[in-house]
UniProtKB/Swiss-Prot annotation:
Keywords: Carbohydrate metabolism, Glycosidase, Hydrolase, Polysaccharide degradation, Signal, Xylan degradation. It comes from Verticillium longisporum (Verticillium dahliae var. longisporum). GO terms for molecular function: cellulose binding; endo-1,4-beta-xylanase activity. Residues 31-219 form the GH11 domain. It catalyses: Endohydrolysis of (1->4)-beta-D-xylosidic linkages in xylans. Belongs to the glycosyl hydrolase 11 (cellulase G) family. It is an enzyme of class 3 (hydrolase). The keyword Hydrolase applies. This is Ethylene-inducing xylanase 3. Residues 252-287 form the CBM1 domain. Residues 1-19 form the signal peptide. GO terms for cellular component: extracellular region. It comes from the Eukaryota.
Amino acid sequence: MVCFSSLFVAASAIAVVFASPVDHEQLAKRQSTPSSQGTHDGYFYSWWTDGGAAATYTNLAGGEYSVSWSNGGNLVGGKGWNPGSARTITYSGTYNPNGNSYLAVYGWTRNPLVEYYVVENFGTYNPSSGATARGQVTHDGALYRLFESTRTNQPSIDGTATFQQYWAVRDVKRTGGTVNMATFFNAWTSAGMRLGTHNYQVVATEGYFSSGSARINVAGGGGSTPSPPSTPSPPTTPSPPPVTPPPSGGGSCAARWGQCGGSGWNGATCCSAGTCQAQNQWYSQCL
């Protein structure tokens, strides 16, 4: 005799077993930090995730943040400034990627719409792979290789759009140092890679269908987007030479002890006090 209650219990157990992976995936998504932007403790921050990874982003004191991720998906976040500029940035911390990930100064411009990266470290995949080489630049004792690529109908600060990506990838990986953004802006511009009006600029950790963790502390500031040259002022009309005041003592006559004559002398030839007496061919004096 078949026990239907036993079959029901067994079927329920099987259903739970098959449902568990789906439930865990949904739970991971629910536990991820939602995308957001804003300011925290004096720094701008940006955090974006497509929801496909179990990812946690945390703003810490000052310019510090931490991030950990797993289970796939795309995510990027960090702290910095808004707007970006040609500032000198220093950063330090720990970065532990497992798979496709990179640590970079990351930012955007508008008009033209450009996403840019100065890559300081990366995981198993060089993010510039497949991009067009545009030269190289040396900065802070290391070689950075320049690349450009086009992103078609991809997420951007203006929604889904087509835009350019600019890359500068450091040959020798590091997690900590100084990045002078003016060096890279100038190098890209010299290679014909035009930037627009700056939006945000952060020292970011990005992950793509990988796992890992990072804790990064950002500092710096100052600097600015170079201003256009000012309009030169018109030349100033030279002032006339100052007029020598007349000799003191009254009228146009020389004062006592003053010169009153001599070969080539064009000044006063009379004396307001005393008499003009020749001392030699070249000099006469009021005595």
